[in-house]
């Protein structure tokens, strides 16, 4: 059985590349096809606060023009739509204690793999500042990312999302030469309690 592939055309071609339109492909194991959500363009995950926001503030700016919100700012909108989001494959539960270190994780018994794992705190230098009360975790990504020769992939959390309860460690991966899945390390920055 063949791998499941999700492909998107890329809009830019590096100098000297072939005239064929470059594509990014997300490939998962066949047994996961239909059991996990597919990667999608980032704009599909625009935050609710942004969707609710009016373009105009209902008042004039210093020049007598309509006062505009960040929704009228093309650089912000472009950043929200830049790239792709790989959704968490399964529902998870976190129990975050006051110490923010001994985090308990849970998910359904029938999932084919653990969607989250812990890193050793020493990998980020914890408990030294700024990680005095931190447990590094990682999102387990079931999708391999394929790009044409000469392309690399920036892995980061969605841009302009102060509402998210986690902060990812960003990384740049040469996916044109790296033929395996890439996990995403992060810190829980949300409140303590059950989530």
Give residue ranges: language-model regions.
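Non-catalytic terminal segments and appended small domains
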Residues: 1-178, 189-195
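Short strand-edge motifs at loop-to-beta-strand transitions and within beta-strands
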Residues: 182-186
